[in-house]
C-alpha cells in the first residue's frame, strides 16, 4: 500500500478536511482489527520474535512489515481514531490490551515466523469478548470464539 499525504491526494481527488473520526471504544477498535484481519483470512502475516524476553523499551518499539499490527495501521479509520504507528507499544496503548494479550496474537513462540490472518483475527476477537465480559463468563465466551 502506498501512503500519500493529504496534499498529494487533494491533487487527484476531493478530500474533506472536516472529517471527524467517530470515537471508537477500545473494544470497538479490537473488533474492527479482527474484521480487517478476516478480510483475507489465509494471508500469511509475520510475527514478532521473543516479545516476552525483551525489556519494555525494546518490546514497545518492536514492529514488522506485514504483521497483524501493520494491517490495523493501514486502516484509515483506526489511524483517524488515533493509531500512530505499527509498533507493539502503540498497539498496546491504542487497543488498551495487556502484554499477555498481544503476546498471544503476535509472538513467534506460538506460531513460528508467520501466522494466518484468520487465526490472528480469532485471537483479537477473543480479547474483545473478554474485554466486554470480564470475569469467568468472559473467559468462557472467549474460549468459544477461538
Which positions does each model-derived feature cover?
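Catalytic phosphate/metal-binding cores of nucleic-acid and nucleotide-processing enzymes, i.e., regions
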Residues: 2-145
Amino acid at each position: 500500500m502506498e501512503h500519500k499525504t493529504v496534499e498529494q491526494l487533494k491533487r487527484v481527488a476531493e478530500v474533506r478536511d472536516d472529517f471527524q473520526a467517530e470515537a471508537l471504544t477500545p473494544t470497538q477498535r479490537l473488533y474492527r482489527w479482527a474484521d480487517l484481519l478476516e478480510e483475507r483470512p489465509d494471508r500469511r502475516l509475520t510475527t514478532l520474535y521473543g516479545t516476552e524476553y525483551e525489556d519494555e523499551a525494546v518490546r514497545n518499539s518492536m514492529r514488522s512489515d506485514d504483521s497483524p499490527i501493520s494491517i490495523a495501521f493501514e486502516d484509515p479509520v483506526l489511524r483517524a481514531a488515533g493509531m500512530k504507528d505499527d509498533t507493539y507499544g502503540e498497539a498496546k496503548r491504542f487497543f488498551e490490551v495487556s502484554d499477555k494479550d498481544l503476546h498471544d496474537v503476535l509472538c513467534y513462540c506460538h506460531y513460528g515466523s508467520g501466522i494466518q490472518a484468520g487465526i490472528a483475527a480469532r485471537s483479537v476477537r477473543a480479547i474483545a469478548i473478554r474485554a466486554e465480559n470480564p470475569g469467568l463468563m468472559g473467559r468462557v465466551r472467549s474460549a468459544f470464539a477461538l
